[in-house]
Amino acid sequence: MEDKKKKRSPKPCLTQPAQAPGTLRRVPVPTSHSGSLALGLPHLPSPKQRAKFKRAGKEKCRPVLAGGGGGSAGTPLQHSFLTEVTDVYEMEGGLLNLLNDFHSGRLQAFGKECSFEQLEHVREMQEKLARLHFSLDVCGEEEDEEEEEDGVTEGLPEEQKKTMADRNLDQLLSNLEDLSNSIQKLHLAENAEPEDQPAA
């Protein structure tokens, strides 16, 4: 049991009891086994997982240096954070304010004039337009396939098909124009706001 633990972690962790300086123990790995068997892993991890393991290994375990430089051998080193605690509290407060604004509906995307309801309306129009465009495309393909299979054009006369296609195309263009106008209003509101602020 003890041998398996040593094989799994050949590098001594700082949390383990410290050894005398200059005495690093190496666990012999049989040459007949692959690296994954020597580590007790069932298979080699993917490249992403390997990078994750490397990072986790660097953070958790560090070999004890021969010189013993930088602290006593018996006490573990503490991780030093690059971010100040006050900065973390400030970011936390900002995120909480953002969350409160989101839940209250005060969150603005393109300025004070544009709300998420307007953006939601634009998104719904885009989806409606995409569905209409897709259904027109599918209907046209199905009609072409039916005509090829039958060899004879049954169903609607050619003139009716043309008027129906024109009507659908007009509806598609009308929806596209509405969508374009809505997006244009959002952009105009966004561009107008920076001009208003310096004057105030």
UniProtKB/Swiss-Prot annotation:
A GO cellular-component term linked to this record: cytoplasm
Coiled-coil regions listed: 158-189
Biological process (GO), any one: cilium assembly
Biased composition (Basic residues): 1-10
InterPro entries linked: CCDC28
Residue ranges with Acidic residues bias: 140-152
Pfam family, one: CCDC28
Tissue specificity: Expressed in the retina, pericardium and limb epithelium.
Alphabetical UniProt keywords: Acetylation, Cilium biogenesis/degradation, Coiled coil, Cytoplasm, Cytoskeleton, Phosphoprotein
Residues annotated with N-acetylmethionine modification: 1
Domain of life: Eukaryota
Modification sites for Phosphoserine: 46, 115
PANTHER family in UniProt: CHEMOKINE C-C MOTIF RECEPTOR 1, COILED-COIL DOMAIN-CONTAINING PROTEIN 28B
Subunit structure: Interacts with BBS1, BBS2, BBS4, BBS5, BBS6, BBS7 and TTC8/BBS8. Interacts with MAPKAP1/SIN1 isoform 1 and RICTOR.
Function noted in UniProt: Involved in ciliogenesis. Regulates cilia length through its interaction with MAPKAP1/SIN1 but independently of mTORC2 complex. Modulates mTORC2 complex assembly and function, possibly enhances AKT1 phosphorylation. Does not seem to modulate assembly and function of mTORC1 complex.
Protein name according to UniProt: Coiled-coil domain-containing protein 28B
Natural source organism: Mus musculus
